[in-house]
Design a protein with these regions (language model features):
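Active-site catalytic microenvironments in core metabolic enzymes, especially phosphate/sugar-handling
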Residues: 1-305
Length: 305
């Protein structure tokens, strides 16, 4: 990929979600790149979107475009995430970096900047769930971040997590079905509020029955691992995220909050096609200079059998 085309893509990605919105602990932006482009490379350049980069995903990206490699991988989760003290093939993260560099494939990660951005991942997650409640979706009376970003970006609706107050109450059972419908999942994990008593001890059918009687007028979402963020959504009846710790779940239940867990990346991956479409729209007349492909082999490592 030419440096001019790489800069054009990076500028478009910054327009979608400024990297300044990412957590201070995060590793975002252009993580792997050659200083010089491949001389024979010409448009269209190949852009591969994935939630995570395992070696299986990387190997697929190297032949996914009619046998040609990706010029740029946009990976929601960063690789590397933590600092690498050495680069050897024995380390999974350094193996990915070395292999990508050897094929002149750049790696970009937005991670928490996508989470916090207005119209970003958490807005997509909330809107999709609310829109999947019942036949025509549910009306929302109020909405916003669980934790507002500072400054001008906060005024524009940026921040961590998203919460919404429904115009009319629904049930936990309906929200469960809405989550499954939006994320195209066959199952999710559900933690009941303590008011449901010992229903959880009765197994799945008892939990389903109890969920029918749990009213929900206020819900909160956080993509990925949302325990620390959702703790601030104190008025919510239900928290929706990918994963939480055992003790976070117990504390939520004791506080009267139901929890729906999807597995970490299952509430993130569906946003990738949306990003591909938005990038194409931003690029306008120059969109034809790129080919976008969402990974067909990237998947959450956990499967419920």
């Amino acid at each position: 990929m030419s440096l001019a085309h790489l800069r054009l893509l990076l500028s478009s990605l910054e327009s979608l979600a400024p990297l300044s919105l990412a957590g201070s602990w995060d590793n975002v932006g252009l993580l792997v790149a050659h200083s010089r482009p491949t001389p024979e490379a010409t448009p269209p350049y190949n852009v591969y979107l994935t939630n995570d980069i395992s070696m299986q995903v990387l190997e697929h990206s190297l032949t996914a475009f009619d046998g040609q490699p990706a010029s740029l991988i946009i990976s929601y989760h960063p690789t590397p995430f933590q600092a690498l003290k050495k680069f050897t093939l024995e380390s999974p993260a350094s193996r990915v970096v070395l292999t990508a560099a050897a094929h002149n494939t750049a790696i970009f990660s937005p991670h928490t900047s996508w989470d916090a951005a207005p119209s970003g991942l958490n807005d997509w997650l909330l809107d999709g769930i609310v829109g999947a409640l019942g036949e025509g979706g549910a009306a929302v009376r109020a909405r916003g971040p669980v934790r507002l970003a500072a400054g001008d970006m906060g005024a524009r609706g940026a921040g961590d997590g998203r919460a919404a107050t429904l115009a009319a109450p629904t049930t936990l059972a309906a929200v469960v079905e809405g989550v499954k419908r939006h994320l195209r999942l066959g199952s999710v994990a559900v933690s009941l509020p303590a008011s449901c008593g010992a229903a959880a001890a009765g197994g799945a059918e008892a939990v389903r029955a109890a969920a029918q009687g749990v009213p929900v007028s206020h819900l909160a979402v956080c993509a990925g691992s949302g325990g620390s963020v959702l703790g601030g959504a104190t008025s919510a009846n239900v928290w929706i995220t990918g994963e939480m710790s055992h003790h976070e779940l117990l504390a939520a239940s004791a506080a009267g909050v139901a929890v729906i867990l999807t597995h970490h990346s299952n509430c993130e991956r569906g946003f990738l096609p949306v990003v591909a479409g938005r990038l194409g729209a931003l690029l306008g007349d120059r969109a034809g200079e790129f080919r976008f492909l969402v990974s067909a082999v990237d998947a959450d490592p956990l499967t419920t059998l």
